[in-house]
A protein has these predicted regions:
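Acyl-donor (CoA/ACP) binding surface of acyl/acetyltransferases
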Residues: 1-34, 60, 64-180
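Conserved GNAT-fold acetyl-CoA-binding loop/helix
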Residues: 30-51
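Conserved, charge-rich beta-strand/loop surface module that forms ligand/interface-binding patches
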Residues: 43-44, 56, 125
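A short helix-loop-beta-strand connector motif used in the catalytic cores of GNAT acetyltransferases and
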Residues: 50-62
């Protein structure tokens, strides 16, 4: 993937040079509280995930600010047949600025045009409704409850909510933009 630019951001493949900044983001308990990465607790845990999951993949991307070229988070797809399940996280300093929705619009195009997904889905914990609002801003449709999830590490029980966007709806809504 070449980089994709939005008004304020650069979306690009993650690099070895991003290790320390991404580690800082993903080892922040508040950032990963509602994500699949909440069980990363140590630099060693992160190192393994970084090497095997974030580098050299067409599915994970760094989010960098144009103004100072700082890595502020990541966005990724988990492919499941013709569906891409998305995950994203931003450093706390980047919260509340509309970055995820801005990136999401470009990444929907990438998911449909380049990765050829027929459907993009996103999940969030019911007690984190801000994520649901961001998904709606990205043009996704609320599917309601996806079921209950129990953390294998903490035993925490969460209701998981889901949103989706189909290729057909994306084309009908005219929300597409150039992906690459």
């Amino acid at each position: 993937m070449r980089q994709i630019q939005t008004d304020r951001l650069i979306i690009r493949p993650l690099l070895i040079a991003d290790h320390d900044e991404l580690q800082e983001i993903l080892l922040d308990p508040q950032v990963v509280r509602y994500t699949r990465y909440r069980d990363l607790k140590t630099p060693e845990n992160f190192d393994n995930v970084f090497a095997t999951h974030f580098l050299e993949t067409p599915f994970a991307f760094g989010i960098e600010t144009k103004i100072d070229h700082k890595l502020i988070g990541f966005y990724e797809f988990h492919p499941e047949a013709t569906t891409g399940v998305l995950t994203y996280a931003l450093s706390q300093s980047a919260w509340g600025q509309g970055f995820v929705a801005e990136v999401g619009t470009a990444m929907m195009a990438y998911g449909f045009e380049v990765l050829n997904f027929e459907r993009i889905e996103a999940h969030y914990a019911s007690h984190n409704p801000r994520s649901g609002k961001v998904m709606a801003k990205m043009g996704m449709r609320d599917l309601g409850s996806f079921g209950i999830s129990v953390s294998p590490h903490t035993g925490e029980v969460r209701e998981v909510m889901a949103y989706e966007l189909t290729r057909e709806d994306w084309l009908l809504n005219g929300s597409q933009q150039q992906a690459v």
